[in-house]
Amino acid sequence: MRMTKRVLIAGFTGAMGQKAVNLVNSLSDFKIVAGLSPSAENDPQKYNLPEDAQIFNSLDEIPDNLTDIWIDFTLPKAVYNNVKFALTHHISPIVGTTGLSDGQEAELIEISKEEKVGGIIAPNFGISAVLLMKFAKEAAKYFPDVEIIEMHHADKKDAPSGTALATAKMIAENRPAHQTAPDEVETLENVRGGDYEGIKIHSVRLPGYVAHEQVLFGGTGEALTIRQDSFDRQSFMSGVKVALEKVDQLNELVVGLENIL
C-alpha cells in the first residue's frame, strides 16, 4: 500500500494556489498538511484546506518534518527563499512561480544536489505550453528569424513570462545568436520588445486574458506561427498532477515539465 504523501501549498490563497488545493484534495495518495501565505487567517476551511491543516504566515513558523512536498504558487520576490527553505529541509519542491533568475536557478540546483533532494521548476504546467516550446525548438533549426509574443492577465507581476523566456532559451539552443534586423532604429524606446540572444520578446498585460503565447518564425516567402492558449487555470493542473506523481523519482532539481513527461 502506498504511503500518503504530505503536501504544503505556498500561495494557497491565490487563484493558482486554490486550483492546487482542489487538485490535491481530489487525490487519494496526497494530503494537504499545511499552507503558507503571509496574510492568511488561521481558518483552514475558509480556503478549502482540510480541517486539520496548519496555516503559516512566514517561513520561520514552519516546523521540521512537517511535509514531503512543497507546491509553490507565490510571487517572484518570495520564490527563491521558499525553494531554498524547502530544499534545505529535505522537502521536494514543485514550483510554478516564475521570476527566478538564471543565477538563482543554478544556485538552487546546486543546493538540491548537495542535499540530494529532487524537485521541479516549471515555467508552465500546461501540456499545450510544453508542446509549444518543444515544437518551437525544433522549428528554430529551419527558421532562425523568430519573435515571441506572450499575453497574460493584467495582474501578472513579472515580464516576460517564464514560459516566453524558457521558449527563447530553447530556441537559442538550436540556432546561433542571430539578429533579424541589426540596423533598425527605434523612434519609440523599447518598441521592439526585450531581446534574448537576438530573439525579440513582446509582453502584453490585459484584463480578459489568462495565459497565451505565439512564436512567429519568418523565412523567404513563408512564415510559421505556433500558438498556445490557456483559457482556464485548471489547464495547468494536469502538469501539477504529473509532477506530484513523479517528483519522488528525481534526485535533483530539474527545470521544465518536459523533463518528467
UniProtKB/Swiss-Prot annotation:
Subcellular location per the Swiss-Prot or TrEMBL entry: Cytoplasm
Keyword NADP annotated: yes
Pfam family for this entry, one: DapB_N
Gene Ontology, cellular component aspect: cytosol
Enzyme class: oxidoreductase
Residue positions binding (S)-2,3,4,5-tetrahydrodipicolinate: H153, G162, T163
Annotated pathway: Amino-acid biosynthesis; L-lysine biosynthesis via DAP pathway; (S)-tetrahydrodipicolinate from L-aspartate: step 4/4
Catalytic activity: (S)-2,3,4,5-tetrahydrodipicolinate + NAD(+) + H2O = (2S,4S)-4-hydroxy-2,3,4,5-tetrahydrodipicolinate + NADH + H(+); (S)-2,3,4,5-tetrahydrodipicolinate + NADP(+) + H2O = (2S,4S)-4-hydroxy-2,3,4,5-tetrahydrodipicolinate + NADPH + H(+)
Residues engaged in binding NAD(+): G11, F12, T13, G14, A15, M16, G96, T97, T98, A122, P123, N124, F125
NCBIfam families per record: dapB
Similarity comment: family membership: Belongs to the DapB family.
Name of the protein in its database record: 4-hydroxy-tetrahydrodipicolinate reductase
Annotated organism of origin: Lactobacillus acidophilus (strain ATCC 700396 / NCK56 / N2 / NCFM)
Name of the gene encoding the protein in the UniProt record: dapB
